[in-house]
Amino acid sequence: MAKTIQAIRGMNDCSPTESPLWQWVEGKVRSVLQNYGYSEVRMPIVESTPLFARAIGEVTDVVSKEMYTFWDNDEQLTLRPEGTAGCVRAAIEHGWIYNQEQRLWYMGPMFRHERPQKGRYRQFHQAGVEVFGIPNPEIDAELIMLTARLWKELGIAEHVTLQLNSIGSLEARKNYRSALVAFLQQHVDLLSEEEKERLEKNPLRILDTKNQALQEVLNDAPKLLAYLDDDSREHFAQLCALLDAVGIQYEVNPKLVRGLDYYNKTVFEWVTSALGAQGTVCGGGRYDGLVEQLGGHATTGVGFAMGLERLVLLVQEVNQSIRLPSAVDIYVVYQGEGTTLAAFQLAETLRTELPQLRVMTHCSGGNFKKQFKRADKSGATLALVIGESEVQNQQVVVKHLLGGAEQQTLALDDIVDYIKNNF
């Protein structure tokens, strides 16, 4: 026997029993985004490597350690580690945002070479939203309201908490960076080698350290909010007032900075502790300089992304009220001379007349006992039975697989109306 080939570590298959929940979650995401008037876009999963280096920042962990990069002739390409950079590139390239506002969303796989763990994999899926051309804090509030509505739709609203911060302008962050570095240099003995490297290249990333001793020291560190420019401070105050007005609770977290360099002003995360250690379910913020940084006209931007693996896990963990549909509603079984043609004609008629129902035809042969066993396993509500006598009499037997109702024999011409009225 030939040696079997396994999936790549951190890149998972989605089984037939898992996919209904994924489809349900993705359907809720699409529904809420469409309800708010957002338009779907689709971008390639492979982009030019310099796109991410320029957008995300060369000293970030994502670019320096986690990207899947390869050469195609003379061009360096990367499997996308996130969606914002590609969406901005597409918007500039196709003129979607020139002198106009855009509310866009996308969904698909992303790739990062991280250590696989629960809810975090090397191939993972994100739903993302990007809004261009609206500088006001109202749109920041709308994105947060949108996500809050989605959590209600998914039945997880009681298990997520909103954390909010403002990281101000580039100039404000430079001033804060100097103060933070001066503070951390007094505690350099607590820093790991990786954190010492961050101190040199990207000190703000130390604020979300998992080092417990350092976390306690950081409680006394300078607060970024104290270094905000007036415009950022006013923007943040208006955002908080809007969230207060619509009743969305939040916690101002002065250590929240996000892991990508393109953010400014508002940053936010929805976090949960229902999956063990506190984890981020959704995160985003403003990136008002990114479009210009990637060669477009100066255009404001704000967005978020949510990890679908973690979202599916959270729904599984806390929402026990979901009733997912089975893969099959009606199972057509047949046995005997001339029954195959009749069964296939019946199944196609049902698919035409009742397109909302899922109709499966048994194609494996075998006696009725074997076929009913397969019908039960499919989760179907009804089995429609065609034998030789049913073919001769233009009839079909209706067998209820759930609920215990007695089986009935109906004329073929009546079966569509019967199912419409009773199913």
UniProtKB/Swiss-Prot annotation:
GO terms for molecular function: ATP binding; histidine-tRNA ligase activity. Its EC number is 6.1.1.21. GO terms for cellular component: cytoplasm. It is found in: Cytoplasm. Keywords: Aminoacyl-tRNA synthetase, ATP-binding, Cytoplasm, Ligase, Nucleotide-binding, Protein biosynthesis. It catalyses: tRNA(His) + L-histidine + ATP = L-histidyl-tRNA(His) + AMP + diphosphate + H(+). Its main location: cytoplasm. GO terms for biological process: histidyl-tRNA aminoacylation. Homodimer. Belongs to the class-II aminoacyl-tRNA synthetase family. PANTHER family: HISTIDINE--TRNA LIGASE, MITOCHONDRIAL-RELATED, HISTIDYL-TRNA SYNTHETASE. NCBIfam families: hisS. This is Histidine--tRNA ligase. It comes from Pasteurella multocida (strain Pm70). The gene is hisS.
